[in-house]
Each structure stands twice: as structure tokens, then as C-alpha cells.
Design a protein with these regions (language model features):
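Bacterial Sec-dependent N-terminal signal peptides
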Residues: 1-20
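Substrate-binding clefts and catalytic carboxylate motifs of secreted carbohydrate-active enzymes
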Residues: 29, 37, 41-46, 57, ...
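Substrate-binding cleft/loops of secretory-pathway carbohydrate-active enzymes
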Residues: 171-202, 224-228, 271-278
């Protein structure tokens, strides 16, 4: 998915001296493409983000991806200390943010800035590959950007013979494949950010004419643009359990399932962010808890179960309706929610219910969004699996979030979008009660 990064600044980069860069190549051997790091095959089990590195190592990951060179040396050093490698991003500017790829002065300035950045860190032992641009094709009209991508990739090969280059597109499009092949031949690896369409990549990339290796540079749950919507046009999010099932199936069927050409992948997002909701893409809570997705990835990557696993949230209903049933209530009316959740370790669970207004700060391409504040009232009584509350007094769209914590650094979640209709004056006002948490023990 797409993270908004600062416009490139022409900062003074100093060249760092490293004892011995580790050579990375991309080679085809007996019909199978692979990374070769220090002469040995290297399968990328990656994550998009640069925090929680110890957790990534614990679950069997070996590589992280950045989108820019911000704090590059610090990130490389931290990764190297944990035995991880880095796909280092070079944030090529986007047309949708106002950059003009017909302006030779700006294009050259960007190239010169990247040259300095590459020279500074090219010999770091944690460096795996250069990510030359991320989704520069998103909502673009000027295809000259691919000539600029070629200039950057060609420059990298001139100054750094030890690391391959990759460029990343938003999904996979036949025209982009053609343009990259024709205009950016110095790109070694095709990077694809894809979500619900991951299952079509193996077939499409061959049909579109890319015969070399590729990485799935971002993947995860169904994107907010790919799912069903309510009658009031907001997307319906998968629960933590639904996402866990999807991650496991997609990895086994579509990433491992194209081992001849897919030479690695990066689960998204190795962190937390607001994008449509606070939970859509992040694999961590705001406090750093992890969910069922990470448990499943650990089992896939290591063959071992986590010593303590996240709760499994099987279902949640609001007024006896699921999230797919366009729940509507009157302002101030009492609502009833039912939850079915279990913990594989029998841990004591804490359940937290929140009513949050539907986000109005919706951006595109992963640009930064502000999170709406929860409605600070309404829960009247509850237990681990049931709660009663009053609907908000203001008309509009909301989401009922439920978060379940096991006290061991794990959580589960679900949200149900609902619409509040305006209450007429003669209907009277409902009593408002402060929201709180409920603590309960697994049966």
C-alpha cells in the first residue's frame, strides 16, 4: 500500500565506508529465478516497514522494505544487527503530487540527489536491492516518468555493481509492463503492490510479456477499493480472523505457488496506520500488539506455532445483523452487539468496544490520513460476548469497533459500519453513558 513520504530534499549525504559489501545477484538457474546473496540462493520473506525488527526475526522473516532513504543508515544498521536485509527505497516523485517529468531541471536534480544517496550507503552489508520508485504510475498521465526511472536504475548499475534494481507499480497493467521493458531496461526485478488481485499475477505477468523475476512488494487483505460497500458507500473491512485466513491462503497459493518467477514478497503493513480505518492494513495495534495474521505467517515461515497465540474473533453482530447487512439505527436508540471470540491458549480476555465516526479524511495511494476521534459515551452494560449501548445522537455514518486483548501482546478486532438516522424532536432524548472496558475470562 502506499505510504506518503516527504518530498525529496537535497540534503548533504556523506559516503560511508563499509568493509565488504555483500554482492547480490538475480539469476535464472534451471528455469527458476532467485536472488543470490554472497553466492547463495536467498528467498525473501519480507515485511513492508522498519519497526518491530525482533518480532520479524522471531516469526522467520529475513528482509524489510523501505519507501525512501529517510534514516537509511540507521535502518540498515538496525537490520544488519538482527541479521535482516533491506530493499532500500528511492522515493521518485509522483505526478499526482505536482512533479513534472517534462521539466529537465527537476528531473536532473532528482537524479543527482539519488546519486548522492546511493553512493552513501551502496556498500552496506544489509543492502539487498534498490527500490526505484513506488507506484509512480498511480493516477499518472505522463509516461515520461519511465525514462527517469531508467536514468536512475542505469546510474545505480554504474556506481553500484553489487545490487539489483526494482521498480514498483500499483497493481499489474499490461501497458506498464510494456513501458518498463521498453523505457527502463536497467530494471532487474518487477515489483508489484497487489491485494485482492494477487491470485491473477502469475497468469497476467506472463501474458503481459514480463519474462524475468518479480517480487510482490506489498500484499495483504483485500484493499478498501476492492470490497463490498454499504448503501451509504463506505467499504466493509475484513476482521482480523478473516484477514488471517486470506494471508495464509494467498501466500501458499500465489507466492509460493509461483516459485519459478516470484523471488520474494513483503507483507503489508509491518506497523500501524490510519488508512480508511485504523486497522485495515496494519499488522500491529497502536500499542504494538499483534494479531492472528502474524501467528499464521510464523507457522508458514518457520513450521512452528507461536508459544502464545492471538485471540480468534469468529463473528460480531449489531442488532442481530452482520456488517454486510447495512445496519441502520435511530439516533439515541439502544443497540445490542454480540461477539463470538475464543483464545487458543485459554487466556483471560479484555474486550473494548468503541464507536467511531466514519472517516472523512480519505486520501489515495496511502497518503497520510487523520483518524476520527471515538464517540466518548454510550456503552451501558456488557460482558465478554455481549454489550448494550446507545447510538450516537448525530446523524451520519459510524463504525462499531471491538478489540479483544489477551494480556500477552496479542489482539483481535472487527468493525461494523452502521448509519444513524436523525431523531425527531418528539421522540425524546436517550440517556448518555460513558464508554468503558469489560474484563472477562474465557469459558
Amino acid at each position: 500500500m502506499r505510504i506518503l513520504l516527504q518530498l525529496f530534499g537535497f540534503l548533504a549525504w556523506s559516503i560511508h565506508s563499509f568493509a565488504n559489501p555483500i554482492k547480490v545477484e538475480v539469476k535464472e538457474v534451471n528455469g527458476k529465478w532467485s536472488f543470490y546473496r554472497d553466492g547463495k540462493p536467498y528467498e525473501v520473506k519480507g515485511a513492508g516497514g522498519h519497526d518491530h525488527l525482533e518480532k520479524l526475526v522471531d516469526i522467520g522473516g529475513n528482509c524489510i522494505r523501505t519507501w525512501s532513504t529517510d534514516n537509511a543508515l540507521e535502518i540498515l544498521d538496525a537490520a544488519h544487527a538482527k541479521g535482516l536485509t533491506v530493499m532500500m527505497g528511492l522515493w521518485a516523485q509522483h505526478e499526482r503530487h505536482g512533479f513534472d517529468y517534462d521539466d529537465p531541471v527537476k528531473v536532473k536534480a532528482q537524479l543527482d540527489a539519488f546519486r548522492s544517496e546511493v553512493m552513501a550507503i551502496k556498500d552496506h552489508p544489509a543492502l539487498l536491492m534498490w527500490g526505484v520508485g513506488n507506484e509512480v504510475d498511480l493516477f499518472y498521465t505522463n509516461t515520461n516518468v519511465w525514462y527517469a526511472i531508467e536514468d536512475i536504475a542505469k546510474m545505480i548499475h554504474e556506481v553500484d555493481p553489487n545490487h539489483p534494481t526494482c521498480t514498483v507499480t500499483a497493481g499489474l497493467d499490461k501497458e506498464e509492463v510494456r513501458l518498463i521493458k521498453e523505457r527502463a531496461p536497467s530494471i532487474d526485478v518487477y515489483g508489484i503492490n497487489t491485494y485482492g488481485d494477487l491470485g491473477n499475477i502469475k497468469k497476467n505477468i506472463r501474458e503481459y510479456g514480463w519474462t524475468g523475476p518479480y517480487v510482490i512488494s506489498e500484499w495483504g487483505p483485500n484493499g478498501h477499493w476492492e470490497v463490498a460497500k454499504t448503501e451509504w458507500n463506505v467499504p466493509i473491512e475484513q476482521s482480523s480472523h478473516e484477514k488471517a485466513v486470506v494471508y495464509e491462503e494467498r501466500y501458499r497459493d500465489y507466492i509460493v505457488g509461483d516459485a519459478d518467477h516470484c523471488i520474494g514478497s513483503f507483507i503489508f503493513l509491518w506497523g500501524q496506520k490510519q488508512e480508511t480505518t485504523s486497522t485495515w492494513y496494519g499488522l500491529f495495534s497502536e500499542r504494538g500488539e499483534t494479531g492472528e495474521v502474524i501467528d499464521r505467517m510464523q507457522r508458514i515461515w518457520t513450521g512452528k506455532e507461536a508459544t502464545n497465540r492471538a485471540p480468534i474473533l469468529e463473528s460480531c453482530l449489531l442488532n442481530a445483523a452482520s456488517k454486510n447487512q447495512n445496519v441502520k439505527v435511530m439516533a439515541g436508540d439502544r443497540m445490542e452487539a454480540l461477539l463470538k471470540v475464543s483464545d487458543p491458549d485459554g487466556d483471560r480476555l479484555v474486550v473494548n468496544w468503541l464507536i467511531v465516526p466514519e472517516s472523512t479524511d480519505i486520501k489515495s495511494g496511502g497518503d497520510a490520513e487523520s483518524a476520527p476521534l471515538p464517540v466518548k459515551r454510550k456503552v451501558t452494560k456488557g460482558s465478554k460476548d455481549a454489550v448494550s449501548m446507545f447510538a450516537p445522537s448525530e446523524e451520519g455514518g459510524y463504525r462499531l469497533f471491538v478489540f479483544v486483548y489477551d494480556g500477552h501482546g496479542h489482539y483481535a478486532y472487527e468493525n461494523i459500519p452502521f448509519w444513524v438516522n436523525k431523531r425527531s424532536a418528539e421522540m425524546g432524548q436517550a440517556r448518555m453513558i460513558q464508554m468503558k472496558k469489560f474484563d472477562s475470562i474465557n469459558p
